[in-house]
């Protein structure tokens, strides 16, 4: 996960939790709801970044296997 994106997701989760808790303690339902929403956005961003990371890892694995196959074919043709 890109560091800036990871920090942004974490910031949203923490900020959301603070707002949610503050809203609960003060009885401010709007602030509590805003905090829950912000926290969920942070979790969604984190999930999206995890998917991006896994897709990138998979693409690297496929490229590596492809290159290994090409090298193997070249090696066989050289004999």
From Swiss-Prot:
Pfam families: CsbD. InterPro entries: CsbD, YjbJ_sf. Residues 1-30 are annotated as: Disordered. It comes from the Bacteria. SUPFAM superfamilies: Hypothetical protein YjbJ. Belongs to the UPF0337 (CsbD) family. This is UPF0337 protein YhjA. It comes from Lactococcus lactis subsp. lactis (strain IL1403). The gene is yhjA.
């Amino acid at each position: 996960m890109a560091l800036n994106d990871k920090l942004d997701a974490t910031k949203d989760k923490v900020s959301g939790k603070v707002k949610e808790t503050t809203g609960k303690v003060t009885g401010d339902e709007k602030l509590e709801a805003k905090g829950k929403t912000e926290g969920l956005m942070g979790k969604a961003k984190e999930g999206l970044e995890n998917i991006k990371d896994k897709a990138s890892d998979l693409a690297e694995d496929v490229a590596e296997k492809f290159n290994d196959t090409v090298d193997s074919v070249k090696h066989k043709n050289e004999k």
